[in-house]
Amino acid sequence: MDDSEEDQRLPHHRDPKEFIPLDKLSELGIISWRLNPDNWENDENLKKIREARGYSYMDICDVCPEKLPNYEIKIKNFFEEHLHTDEEIRYCLEGSGYFDVRDENDQWIRVAVKKGGMIVLPAGMYHRFTLDNENYIKAMRLFVGEPVWTPYNRPHDHLPARKEYLDKLLKPEGQAVEAR
């Protein structure tokens, strides 16, 4: 992603364009699926994902000027770099937007989220969200247990969730770690 301060809703490709493979996102702890948003109420794949990952709570949120109270303030808050102490799970039922996430070198990667895309950002990962130029997304928000959506704006490197995330990022599964 480029470093331009231009409209946050634009794609912000680097020049020349650079596309990040899903394997790279997986290395950062991001999980994603492509599901059928037109039949989400009866989607067996969604049910299996929710059961396997313990996503017991869900709601649906329309993000657009006409439907979201205090729209401008909320969009500004979504785009402030932050982390959560729990996973952030979003399933795009309509519309589109971007999650910007930090890689291991603290560089931004822009992840497009479109209709049918479900994404899980790990706890402790710095990120931000913005709509694209369509200015609309209808998203299912999923949580383990009661919903907690507390953003910790950067810097909050002292939080256990951040330390655990960095440990996983720097010491991938299968790599030897020092005994304590």
Swiss-Prot record:
<keyword id="KW-0479">Metal-binding</keyword>
<feature type="binding site">
    <location>
        <position position="127"/>
    </location>
    <ligand>
        <name>Ni(2+)</name>
    </ligand>
</feature>
<dbReference type="GO" id="GO:0010309">
    <property type="term" value="F:acireductone dioxygenase [iron(II)-requiring] activity"/>
</dbReference>
<keyword id="KW-0486">Methionine biosynthesis</keyword>
<dbReference type="Pfam" id="PF03079">
    <property type="entry name" value="ARD"/>
</dbReference>
<dbReference type="GO" id="GO:0005506">
    <property type="term" value="F:iron ion binding"/>
</dbReference>
<keyword id="KW-0408">Iron</keyword>
<keyword id="KW-0560">Oxidoreductase</keyword>
<comment type="similarity">
    <text>Belongs to the acireductone dioxygenase (ARD) family.</text>
</comment>
<comment type="function">
    <text>Catalyzes 2 different reactions between oxygen and the acireductone 1,2-dihydroxy-3-keto-5-methylthiopentene (DHK-MTPene) depending upon the metal bound in the active site. Fe-containing acireductone dioxygenase (Fe-ARD) produces formate and 2-keto-4-methylthiobutyrate (KMTB), the alpha-ketoacid precursor of methionine in the methionine recycle pathway. Ni-containing acireductone dioxygenase (Ni-ARD) produces methylthiopropionate, carbon monoxide and formate, and does not lie on the methionine recycle pathway.</text>
</comment>
<feature type="binding site">
    <location>
        <position position="88"/>
    </location>
    <ligand>
        <name>Fe(2+)</name>
    </ligand>
</feature>
<dbReference type="InterPro" id="IPR011051">
    <property type="entry name" value="RmlC_Cupin_sf"/>
</dbReference>
<feature type="binding site">
    <location>
        <position position="82"/>
    </location>
    <ligand>
        <name>Fe(2+)</name>
    </ligand>
</feature>
<dbReference type="GO" id="GO:0006555">
    <property type="term" value="P:methionine metabolic process"/>
</dbReference>
<dbReference type="GO" id="GO:0010308">
    <property type="term" value="F:acireductone dioxygenase (Ni2+-requiring) activity"/>
</dbReference>
<feature type="binding site">
    <location>
        <position position="84"/>
    </location>
    <ligand>
        <name>Fe(2+)</name>
    </ligand>
</feature>
<dbReference type="GO" id="GO:0016151">
    <property type="term" value="F:nickel cation binding"/>
</dbReference>
<keyword id="KW-0539">Nucleus</keyword>
<dbReference type="GO" id="GO:0019509">
    <property type="term" value="P:L-methionine salvage from methylthioadenosine"/>
</dbReference>
<keyword id="KW-0533">Nickel</keyword>
<dbReference type="GO" id="GO:0005737">
    <property type="term" value="C:cytoplasm"/>
</dbReference>
<dbReference type="InterPro" id="IPR027496">
    <property type="entry name" value="ARD_euk"/>
</dbReference>
<feature type="binding site">
    <location>
        <position position="82"/>
    </location>
    <ligand>
        <name>Ni(2+)</name>
    </ligand>
</feature>
<feature type="binding site">
    <location>
        <position position="84"/>
    </location>
    <ligand>
        <name>Ni(2+)</name>
    </ligand>
</feature>
<dbReference type="GO" id="GO:0005634">
    <property type="term" value="C:nucleus"/>
</dbReference>
<keyword id="KW-0028">Amino-acid biosynthesis</keyword>
<protein>
    <recommendedName>
        <fullName>Acireductone dioxygenase 1</fullName>
        <ecNumber>1.13.11.54</ecNumber>
        <ecNumber>1.13.11.53</ecNumber>
    </recommendedName>
</protein>
<feature type="binding site">
    <location>
        <position position="127"/>
    </location>
    <ligand>
        <name>Fe(2+)</name>
    </ligand>
</feature>
<dbReference type="InterPro" id="IPR014710">
    <property type="entry name" value="RmlC-like_jellyroll"/>
</dbReference>
<dbReference type="InterPro" id="IPR004313">
    <property type="entry name" value="ARD"/>
</dbReference>
<comment type="pathway">
    <text>Amino-acid biosynthesis; L-methionine biosynthesis via salvage pathway; L-methionine from S-methyl-5-thio-alpha-D-ribose 1-phosphate: step 5/6.</text>
</comment>
<feature type="binding site">
    <location>
        <position position="88"/>
    </location>
    <ligand>
        <name>Ni(2+)</name>
    </ligand>
</feature>
<keyword id="KW-0963">Cytoplasm</keyword>
<keyword id="KW-0223">Dioxygenase</keyword>
